[in-house]
């Protein structure tokens, strides 16, 4: 299994995790004890990271399947203790899944751009589909200026380039 340090040394993974949990979260990962399970309070004490930050980081990682917990109930008090461990071995799969989701959204946006004809109000800078523009007799509903045809080819070209780059990075071009 790859260590946290090795994972964080990868610029793409570091950027992804940094965006997800911030600098303090990264600091928690760097100081996270290897092996075993630890409560959020133990982690805060062992790492010197604020307890609220520890909890927020763990929940965020859990939402992405990069951390797991086991729940223990104290039979005397009824209190629950959550014992956490990292699952950063899943980071590549999680990243790929998110890239595929982004690709799906970009494909849908490209289809929308290619399927529709657009009109724009130069005064308000609002873009409308042909259907909406026709419903308003090609007058802006905000300022009543005439709508002009909007050429969205640059948007479509940019979307195609981005889609091609993503597919290439996924090995499915």
From Swiss-Prot:
Pfam families in the cross-refs: TFIIE_alpha
SUPFAM superfamilies given in the database record: Winged helix' DNA-binding domain
UniProt entry keywords in alphabetical sequence: DNA-binding, Transcription, Transcription regulation
Matches recorded under PROSITE patterns: HTH_TFE_IIE
Keyword Cytoplasm: no
Superkingdom of source: Archaea
Gene Ontology biological process terms from the UniProt entry: regulation of DNA-templated transcription; transcription initiation at RNA polymerase II promoter
GO MF annotation terms: DNA binding
Gene3D superfamilies the UniProt entry points to: Winged helix-like DNA-binding domain superfamily/Winged helix DNA-binding domain
Domain (HTH TFE/IIEalpha-type): residue spans on this chain: 9-92
InterPro entries in the cross-refs: TF_E_archaea, TFE, TFIIE/TFIIEa_HTH, TFIIE_asu, TFIIEa/SarR/Rpc3_HTH_dom, WH-like_DNA-bd_sf, WH_DNA-bd_sf
Oligomeric and partner information: Monomer. Interaction with RNA polymerase subunits RpoF and RpoE is necessary for Tfe stimulatory transcription activity. Able to interact with Tbp and RNA polymerase in the absence of DNA promoter. Interacts both with the preinitiation and elongation complexes.
Family matches, as HAMAP family: TFE_arch
Functional summary from the UniProt entry: Transcription factor that plays a role in the activation of archaeal genes transcribed by RNA polymerase. Facilitates transcription initiation by enhancing TATA-box recognition by TATA-box-binding protein (Tbp), and transcription factor B (Tfb) and RNA polymerase recruitment. Not absolutely required for transcription in vitro, but particularly important in cases where Tbp or Tfb function is not optimal. It dynamically alters the nucleic acid-binding properties of RNA polymerases by stabilizing the initiation complex and destabilizing elongation complexes.
Similarity comment text for this entry: Belongs to the TFE family.
Domain remarks in the Swiss-Prot or TrEMBL record: The winged helix domain is involved in binding to DNA in the preinitiation complex.
Name of the featured protein: Transcription factor E
Species the sequence originates in: Methanoculleus marisnigri (strain ATCC 35101 / DSM 1498 / JR1)
Gene designation per UniProt: tfe
């Amino acid at each position: 299994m790859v260590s946290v340090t090795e994972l964080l040394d990868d610029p793409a993974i570091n950027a992804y995790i940094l965006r997800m949990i911030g600098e303090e979260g990264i600091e928690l990962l760097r100081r996270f004890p290897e092996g075993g399970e630890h409560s959020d309070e133990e982690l805060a004490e062992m790492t010197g990271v604020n307890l609220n930050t520890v909890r927020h980081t763990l929940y965020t990682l859990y939402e992405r399947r990069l951390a797991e917990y086991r729940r223990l109930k104290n039979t005397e008090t009824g209190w629950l203790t959550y014992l956490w461990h990292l699952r950063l071995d899943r980071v590549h799969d999680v990243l790929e899944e998110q890239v595929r989701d982004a690709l799906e959204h970009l494909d849908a946006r490209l289809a929308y751009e290619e399927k529709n004809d657009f009109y724009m109000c130069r005064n308000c800078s609002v873009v409308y589909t042909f259907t909406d523009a026709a419903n308003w007799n090609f007058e802006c509903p905000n300022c009543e200026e005439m709508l002009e045809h909007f050429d969205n080819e640059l948007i479509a070209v940019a979307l195609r380039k981005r889609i091609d780059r993503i597919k290439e990075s996924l090995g499915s071009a």
